[in-house]
């Protein structure tokens, strides 16, 4: 950053210094083995990356995933979203010196992580998604207990949310800071909570009418102020929306198998799918060549898409506001350095 009297004059992203070459590894791994690599693009969004890659391969190979597997995938994806947003809340509170809220947010995050561990065996890397379905089922008793735990989590989260949103310190640090109008957000290609905080109705979950989200009549969370406070509100309201989605999945999940046997190898075709990660829309592109090794895998992560907007918001802001502006786009260095 270039500064002039405590004001940011110019900001330039500096990425690519710890590039890991995960996309290149698709040429060296069986297309089914690569799910494990895709999950390691990012720890916070690990399930979503494994799901996005699996969906792309399934569409390319015309594999029909059993309905129960799709509902289970949705449950785990929303648990991952709750985990991500509570992690973000703790970091944001810590950056503002709100240490009690930081500890409370991460205490609730542990409840969510315990549910993930109980149903997948892992807390960060789930390793339950596969091409053709999922590796684990969740029985009725566990689903019933999950619904009770999530109800308790939301009841504890709501008063904490109100305290955060009504606090004078939070208002002074976030309101009117890092403002991005709807027109600017559209021009800069914002996605996810960044776009929804500026009044743009964009959410892949709502766009896919034939998915589980469509059957649950999902409606995205929208704010219109476009500042750091609005972006915080979107993420925190999405925690409660994710709880509602999981409860709907538990009430409506069908019986049946959780995977199908994958036969053959990916054909000479290409395909891409979109997944709404906690930070925004991620694009997954795959290209087959008739062997068990894919010719190409390409991933566009949410942080990359939101970087131009971050540069715009930082120009002209006070140096003291830089950490909060960066935090409210919820950047993921691991996603950028894949």
Each language-model region and where it sits:
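Active-site bordering "gate/hinge" segments
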Residues: 2-338
């Amino acid at each position: 950053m270039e500064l002039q009297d405590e004001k940011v004059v110019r900001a330039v992203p500096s990425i690519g210094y710890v590039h890991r070459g995960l996309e290149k590894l698709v040429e060296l791994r069986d297309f089914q083995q690569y799910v494990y690599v895709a999950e390691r693009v990012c720890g916070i969004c690990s399930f979503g990356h494994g799901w996005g890659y699996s969906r792309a391969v399934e569409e390319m190979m015309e594999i029909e995933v059993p309905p129960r597997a799709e509902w289970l995938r949705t449950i785990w994806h929303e648990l991952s979203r709750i985990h991500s947003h509570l992690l973000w809340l703790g970091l944001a509170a810590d950056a503002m010196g709100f240490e009690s809220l930081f500890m409370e947010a991460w205490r609730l995050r542990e409840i969510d992580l315990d549910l993930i561990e109980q149903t997948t065996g892992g807390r960060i890397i789930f390793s339950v998604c596969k091409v053709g379905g999922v590796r684990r089922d969740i029985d009725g008793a566990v689903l019933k207990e999950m619904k009770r735990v999530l109800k308790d989590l939301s009841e504890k989260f709501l008063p904490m949310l109100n305290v955060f949103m009504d606090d004078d310190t939070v208002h002074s640090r976030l309101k009117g800071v890092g403002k991005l109008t709807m027109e600017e957000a559209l021009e800069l290609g914002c996605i996810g909570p960044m776009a929804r905080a500026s009044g743009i109705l964009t959410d892949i979950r709502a766009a896919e009418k034939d998915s589980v989200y469509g059957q649950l009549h999902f409606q995205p969370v929208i704010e219109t102020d476009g500042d750091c406070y609005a972006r915080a509100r979107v993420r925190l309201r999405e925690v409660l929306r994710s709880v509602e989605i999981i409860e709907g999945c538990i009430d409506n999940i069908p019986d049946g198998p959780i995977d199908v046997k994958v036969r053959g190898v990916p054909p000479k075709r290409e395909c891409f799918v979109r997944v709404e990660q906690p930070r925004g829309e991620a694009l997954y592109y795959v290209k087959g060549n008739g062997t068990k090794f894919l010719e190409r895998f390409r991933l566009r992560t949410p942080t990359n898409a939101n970087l131009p907007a971050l540069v715009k918001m930082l120009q002209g802001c006070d140096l003291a506001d830089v950490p909060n502006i960066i935090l409210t786009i919820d950047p993921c260095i691991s996603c950028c350095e894949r």
